[in-house]
């Protein structure tokens, strides 16, 4: 499958606002012992720019040239890597915080599970993981079920037959199972209005923070 084309998706419509860190991450940031952060799918630096401004050494990985360029111009001190996160090898015992925000649900679960296991296995001891992914309560789930464009595979994964991409939906138990062995710091399943891009629309999201 192809990665989602964020260059096309956000071309000319994505406002560069002053990024504000996710509330849940900000709330537990004091649990992060060191200064090295890895952001898989950095996007426009929603979390990474505030983290860099707080003095963290942030490495951001993204497949989108647009996103990389926006981050570079808004925060030159970020260490930016242009790569598909499926092909990116996480250096062992290097990062005190590894995060991936609104990215993993755009992968087939086989790839996403591999990435999440790599996050868990390569995180430093006492390090933190932060992710958020679509839940099965997301309105897109029902839309995919009734759409001719999306083919239901299994395990709540859909294949977009037009552009050869995937969209996956998760349960809380599934996330807890993937990150078993970590101490759960925070987990929530919420349904909220997204004002971040395009017309206002709802998302069902699972947010998870775990400590090694």
Regions found by a protein language model. Give the residues of each.
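Class I (Rossmann-like) S-adenosyl-L-methionine-dependent methyltransferase catalytic domain
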Residues: 1-32, 44-89, 114, 130-212
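A short acidic, Gly/Pro-enriched loop at the edge of an enzyme's catalytic core
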Residues: 90-98
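Conserved class I S-adenosyl-L-methionine
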Residues: 35-43
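A short glycine-rich, Lys/Arg-flanked "PGG" loop and its adjoining helix->strand segment in the class I
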Residues: 113-125
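A short beta-strand submotif of the Rossmann-like class I SAM-dependent methyltransferase core
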Residues: 100-103
């Amino acid at each position: 499958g192809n990665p989602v084309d964020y260059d096309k998706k956000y071309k000319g419509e994505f406002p560069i606002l002053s990024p504000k860190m996710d509330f849940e991450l900000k709330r537990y940031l004091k649990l992060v012992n060191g200064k090295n952060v890895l952001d898989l799918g950095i996007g426009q630096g929603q979390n990474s720019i505030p983290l860099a401004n707080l003095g963290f050494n942030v490495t951001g990985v993204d497949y989108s040239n647009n996103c990389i360029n926006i981050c570079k111009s808004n925060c030159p001190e970020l260490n930016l890597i242009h790569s598909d996160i499926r092909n990116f090898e996480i250096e062992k015992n290097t990062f005190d915080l590894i995060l991936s925000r609104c990215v993993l649900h755009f992968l087939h679960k086989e790839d996403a599970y591999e990435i999440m296991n790599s996050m868990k296995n390569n995180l430093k001891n006492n390090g933190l993981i932060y992710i958020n992914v679509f839940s099965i309560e997301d309105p897109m789930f029902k839309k995919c079920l009734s759409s001719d464009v999306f083919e239901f595979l299994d395990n709540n994964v859909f294949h977009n037959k037009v552009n050869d991409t995937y969209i996956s939906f998760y349960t809380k138990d599934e996330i807890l199972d993937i990150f078993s062995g970590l101490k759960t710091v925070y987990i929530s399943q919420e349904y909220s209005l997204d004002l971040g891009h395009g017309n206002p629309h709802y998302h069902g999201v699972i947010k998870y923070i775990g400590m090694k």
